[in-house]
Curated annotation (Swiss-Prot):
Recorded GO MF terms: acyl-[acyl-carrier-protein]-UDP-N-acetylglucosamine O-acyltransferase activity
Organism of derivation: Haemophilus influenzae (strain 86-028NP)
Enzyme class, broadest EC rank: transferase
Record lineage: Bacteria, Pseudomonadati, Pseudomonadota, Gammaproteobacteria, Pasteurellales
Protein name as annotated: Acyl-[acyl-carrier-protein]--UDP-N-acetylglucosamine O-acyltransferase
Biological processes, Gene Ontology terms: lipid A biosynthetic process
Main localization (coarse): cytoplasm
Name of the gene: lpxA
Catalytic activity: a (3R)-hydroxyacyl-[ACP] + UDP-N-acetyl-alpha-D-glucosamine = a UDP-3-O-[(3R)-3-hydroxyacyl]-N-acetyl-alpha-D-glucosamine + holo-[ACP]
This protein's pathway: Glycolipid biosynthesis; lipid IV(A) biosynthesis; lipid IV(A) from (3R)-3-hydroxytetradecanoyl-[acyl-carrier-protein] and UDP-N-acetyl-alpha-D-glucosamine: step 1/6
Similarity comment: Belongs to the transferase hexapeptide repeat family. LpxA subfamily.
Compartmental location: Cytoplasm
Length: 262
């Protein structure tokens, strides 16, 4: 079903059964195949390919030669029914690839709202990107990676499969990340190592000084106190009972399976 207000260039190919919403623009030489739904006011500039069971939300801008919902690169994948879901108000730049999920994972590759994926970013199967993240040019996420809100991934960085990156993390350019990165941390290197709290990012997002002070203290407990995570976690849980910003740490450590960067 194609909404009457949608504009589709004559050279674009839209397979029967696709759902194209109000005021959607599909530019020259785009290809839409499979059970695709594109919601209101989303723009596909040109040469964009969208395949499979894919839902793209409202007000997205998708630039030329992006590929969304394509068959993933997991050798175990045998054509099972899996999905790709993209939220609202994302900017997906040239040559970005976003692959559908696998049944061995959660079955869905998902991207939330207000994210910027710069040129040549790769998002592999079963990745979960939340909201307000920035992935700079040539950043690569392996399968099952999770990015929480407000993560910044520097250009040419690569994140190992199953890694979790906590909220408000900033990864410097060229980072190789093989373990989980706790919330609020700045990290860089091969392999990535922590080098402080993302204070500038927290200021921009309205964190007050007492909260930032508490976050810095948690960072010192994790990385400068000479204790293991198991030893400091009860102290962090106690602080989190009265400070919601610190609850991010507790929730993160409950999800972490690969150990944290050191």
């Amino acid at each position: 079903m194609i909404h009457p207000s949608a504009k589709i260039h004559p050279t674009a190919l839209v397979e029967e059964g696709a759902v194209i919403g109000e005021d959607v623009f599909i530019g020259p030489f785009c290809i839409i195949e499979g059970s695709v739904e594109i919601k209101a006011r989303t723009v596909l500039k040109s040469h964009v390919v969208v395949r499979g069971d894919t839902v793209i939300g409202e007000d997205n801008e998708i630039y030329q030669f992006a590929s969304i919902g394509e068959v993933n690169q997991d050798l175990k994948y045998k054509g099972e029914a899996t999905k790709t879901i993209i939220g609202n108000s994302n900017r997906i730049r040239e040559h970005v690839t976003i692959h559908r999920g696998t049944i061995q994972g959660c079955g869905v590759t998902s991207i939330g709202n207000n994210n910027l994926l710069m040129v040549n970013v790769h998002v592999a199967h079963d990745c979960q990107i939340k909201n307000n993240c920035i992935l700079a040019n040539n950043a690569t996420l392996a399968g099952h990676v999770e990015l929480d809100d407000f993560v910044i991934v520097g250009g040419m960085s690569a994140i190992h499969q199953f890694v979790i990156v906590g909220a408000h993390v900033m990864l410097g350019g060229g980072s190789m990340v093989s373990q989980d990165v706790p919330p609020y941390v700045m990290a860089q290197g091969n392999h990535a190592r922590p080098f402080g709290v993302n204070l500038e990012g927290l200021k921009r997002r309205g964190f007050d000084k007492p909260t930032m002070h508490t976050i810095r203290n948690i960072y010192k407990m994790l990385y400068r106190g000479g204790k293991t995570l198991e030893e400091v976690l009860p102290e962090i849980e106690q602080i989190a009972e009265t400070d919601s910003a610190i609850s991010f740490f507790v929730e993160f450590f409950k999800r972490s399976t690969r150990g944290i960067i050191r």
